[in-house]
């Protein structure tokens, strides 16, 4: 990894009515990181989100959960990245992923938005730069395109949620490896993991 990660963003929608919905998987990951590394997240209107700072393997990392709605996530990410002069290549964005089953999570750098409105807005607000890293947290697919909105905005059944939580825990552990500057090792660990019921 040439550029060390300086900012980790967890995507979701604000408010208690969305807190436990599948679309907030990215936000759960950042909250888990804050907890594991004894950080705290606080509302920061300047960056339109909850922000915090932690240290992972001696490296200083900023955390951000945008409090804008999902399709406006770029506003928050760019505000913070611009202020601290963090290039896209040093940003990791965690998000829910329809194309992976619950219990699976994968790191990736660059690529399109795959129809994800949060990623779409971030790419757009970064001036069409898609070179940031992603953590894709599998939530599964409802089967048809028409069902997607209702699916991501509802809670997963208990058994599915357990799989998502297990993959989240593994992603947090793999993040530790990521900060030894070994993306390949972190990917190998996370990509070989699949939670089972």
From Swiss-Prot:
Q: Which SUPFAM superfamilies match?
A: Peptidyl-tRNA hydrolase-like
Q: Please indicate which residues carry the site annotation Discriminates between blocked and unblocked aminoacyl-tRNA.
A: 13
- The protein's site described by Stabilizes the basic form of H active site to accept a proton is found at 96
GO terms of biological process kind: protein quality control for misfolded or incompletely synthesized proteins; rescue of stalled ribosome
**Binding positions (tRNA):** 18, 69, 71, 117
Catalysed reaction(s) here are: an N-acyl-L-alpha-aminoacyl-tRNA + H2O = an N-acyl-L-amino acid + a tRNA + H(+)
What Enzyme Commission number does this protein have?
3.1.1.29
Disulfide bonds, paired cysteine numbers: none
Which top-rank group of organisms is this from?
A: Bacteria
InterPro entries (alphabetical): Pept_tRNA_hydro, Pept_tRNA_hydro_CS, Pept_tRNA_hydro_sf
**Active site, per annotation:** 23
Q: Does the keyword DNA-binding apply?
A: no
Which cellular compartments is it found in? Answer: Cytoplasm
What cellular-component terms does GO give this entry?
cytoplasm
- GO terms, molecular function: peptidyl-tRNA hydrolase activity; tRNA binding
Q: What UniProt keywords are attached to this protein's entry?
A: Cytoplasm, Hydrolase, RNA-binding, tRNA-binding
Q: What is its main location?
A: cytoplasm
Its biological purpose: Hydrolyzes ribosome-free peptidyl-tRNAs (with 1 or more amino acids incorporated), which drop off the ribosome during protein synthesis, or as a result of ribosome stalling.
The record's comment on protein family reads: Belongs to the PTH family.
Whom does it interact with, and what assembly results? Monomer.
Output this protein's name. Peptidyl-tRNA hydrolase
């Amino acid at each position: 990894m040439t550029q060390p990660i300086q900012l980790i963003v967890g995507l979701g929608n604000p408010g208690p009515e969305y807190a436990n919905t599948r679309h907030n998987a990215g936000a759960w990951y950042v909250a888990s990181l804050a907890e594991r590394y004894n950080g705290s997240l606080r509302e920061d209107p300047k960056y339109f989100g909850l922000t915090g700072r932690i240290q992972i393997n001696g490296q200083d990392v900023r955390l951000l959960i945008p409090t804008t709605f999902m399709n406006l996530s770029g506003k928050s990410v760019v505000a913070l990245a611009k202020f601290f002069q963090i290039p896209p290549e040093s940003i990791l964005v965690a998000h829910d992923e329809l194309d992976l089953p619950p219990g699976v999570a994968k790191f990736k750098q660059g690529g399109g938005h795959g129809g994800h409105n949060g990623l779409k807005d971030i790419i757009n607000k970064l001036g069409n730069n898609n070179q940031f890293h992603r953590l894709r947290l599998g939530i599964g697919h409802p089967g048809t395109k028409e069902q997607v909105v209702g699916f991501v905005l509802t809670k997963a059944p208990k058994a599915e949620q357990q799989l998502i939580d297990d993959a989240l825990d593994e992603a947090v552990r793999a993040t530790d490896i990521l900060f030894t500057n070994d993306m390949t090792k972190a990917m190998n660990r996370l990509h070989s993991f699949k939670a089972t019921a």
